[in-house]
Design a protein with these regions (language model features):
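Conserved acidic carboxylate
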Residues: 7, 31
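Charged docking surfaces used in two-component/phosphorelay signaling
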Residues: 14-22
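The feature encodes the CheY-like receiver
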Residues: 55, 73, 85
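C-terminal output helix
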Residues: 105-114
Length: 124
């Protein structure tokens, strides 16, 4: 299963990409929201992990654009945020994200969300 991880923090990328790879996932990385939108279209991942605080295009707008594009609209998106502020989850879901999780990521909880939104049998 292929996951697109949209994140601009190198430490977060290194940590989560390695953990997901060890769990058996192929991980493609975008470092800003615009690149995330482009890679969602070209890579057609099974699921997207989207940081919300991104350069160029924030995660909320990137999620809106991905969900508004017919070729990417069905890709599940899990929003990730270190700022678990009141309203962030609601704002992410309103932007089209399918789920929300906080950073630092608790791996087992995130893996459970990934399996729920993109079960292995749905992988291309």
């Amino acid at each position: 299963m292929k996951i697109l991880y949209v994140e601009d923090n190198d430490d977060n990328i290194y940590m989560l990409k390695n953990r997901l790879t060890r769990a058996g996932y192929t991980v493609v990385v975008a470092t800003d929201g615009a690149q995330g939108v482009a890679l969602a279209a070209s890579e057609q991942p099974d699921l997207i992990l989207m940081d919300l605080s991104l350069p160029v295009l924030d995660g909320w707008e990137a999620a809106r654009r991905i969900k508004a594009t017919p070729t990417t609209s069905r890709i599940p998106i899990i929003a990730l945020s270190a700022h678990a502020m009141t309203g962030d989850q609601e704002k992410a879901l309103a932007a089209g994200c399918d789920d929300f999780d906080t950073k630092p990521v608790e791996l087992q909880r995130l893996l459970d969300k990934i399996r729920t939104l993109a079960p292995p049998e749905s992988a291309a």
